Amino acid sequence: MKTIIVFLSLLVLATKFGDAKEGVNQKQKKEVTQNEFREEYLNEMAAMSLVQQLEAIERALFENEAGRNSRQKRCNGKNVPCGANHSPCCSGLSCEETFGYGWLYKSPYCVIPSNG
């Protein structure tokens, strides 16, 4: 009987102090969640600023790369259509209307210039 009374008294004390600690635990949980949200917010802000910096660097690199990779326009070879809507003929060729292609496709072609 004495042991039951001791265990019941321990149960009552544990329940009483357990409730008190529960309030403290709730306060601690609130503080932890607030700190976590604060840290997450700061981490998000840092990540966003990092993304903005990377985008600025990427823009600068692409501007330099676009200027560096620009090539001269390609030229058309022999027996290729030329004119206003096409690329110019390569050196050594001239854009002329010929009997073989011009009358059928109605456009001049790049050919070796005639001497006559």
Curated annotation (Swiss-Prot):
UniProt xrefs under InterPro entries: Toxin_22
Disulfide-bond pairs as recorded: 75-90, 82-95, 89-110
Tissue: Expressed by the venom gland.
Presence of keyword Lipid biosynthesis: no
Translocase among keywords: no
Function per UniProt: Ion channel inhibitor.
Comment on protein domains: The presence of a 'disulfide through disulfide knot' structurally defines this protein as a knottin.
Protein name in the entry: U16-barytoxin-Tl1a
Organism: Trittame loki
